[in-house]
Amino acid sequence: MTSKSLNAWVIHKQWSGDTSARLKLFTRELGLINCLCKGGRTPKKQSLLQAFIPLWVSIEERYDQYYTRNIESTSSRLDLEGHSLFSGLYINELLYYTLSPDFPDPDLFDAYLFTLNGIALAREREAIEALLRRFEWALLKACGYTFSFLHEARTGELIVPDSYYQFVAGEGFILGGDKEIPGEHLLAIAADNLSESAYLKSAKFIMRQAINHLLGGREIKARSLYGPA
C-alpha cells in the first residue's frame, strides 16, 4: 500500500452505493486519476467534491485502485458564472474525454489552473475565448497532437502571409483548398497574437477541427450551453 499527497481538481463525480463517490481527479502529480472516496456523501465532503475547488488530497493505492484518505480545500471555489462557468465545464469535459489516466503533465496542470483563474476574472467574451484557444493548444500538445503554424504540412515550405491555406485535421495546413485561412492569421496565431477578432475567429475554427479530431466523435455537452469552441 502506498500513500501520496496530491494537488487536485474534481473533474467528474458519480455516487457509488449509499455512502461513497467515484471521482475523476485532475492532479499535478499523477495526471487524471480515478479514485473512490468513502464517505463522500457526508455534508462536509459533499461541499468539497465539486468542480472548481482547488484541493489537497491524500490518497492510498491498493490493488491498482486509488482511495482518498483526506481531502481539504486549499482555497475557496472559483467564482464562475455565465460564459465563465460554461467555459470551465467545457475544459473539464475535454480533460475527461482526452487524457489517459495516470499520465502526469505538470505543464498542462499549470495551463488548466491559469485558464480557470483567467476565465474567472475575464469580463469580455473575447478574452475568455482567447484563454480557451490557448488551453486547447496546450491540451493538444499534451496529447501528442501538434502541427506547425509556420510551415505548409506537405511541402515544409514557410507559411506566406499573403497566401491562403486549408486546415486538414491530422496533418496541418495545406496551400489552397475550400475553407481557406489567410497565412497572416496563421503567423499571428503562431506568435500567440489573438488580439484581433479575425485572428481569434481563425484560431477558433482551427482548434474546433483539431479538438474534434482528438475527440474521435465524442460529444462535448458544454458546447450546447455556450459553444466556446
Curated annotation (Swiss-Prot):
Q: Which InterPro entries does the entry mention?
A: ARFGAP/RecO, DNA_rep/recomb_RecO_N, NA-bd_OB-fold, RecO, RecO_C
Record keywords: DNA repair included? Answer: yes
Keyword DNA repair in annotation: yes
One cellular component term (GO) for this entry is: bacterial nucleoid
Instruction: Tell me which UniProt keywords the record has, alphabetically.
Output: DNA damage, DNA recombination, DNA repair
Query: So where does this one cross the membrane?
Result: none
Coiled coil location = none
Q: Which domain of life is it from?
A: Bacteria
BP GO annotations: DNA recombination; double-strand break repair
Q: Which SUPFAM superfamilies match?
A: ArfGap/RecO-like zinc finger, Nucleic acid-binding proteins
Name the job this protein performs.
Answer: Involved in DNA repair and RecF pathway recombination.
Q: What NCBIfam families does UniProt report for this protein, alphabetically?
A: reco
Family designation:
Belongs to the RecO family.
Q: What is this protein called?
A: DNA repair protein RecO
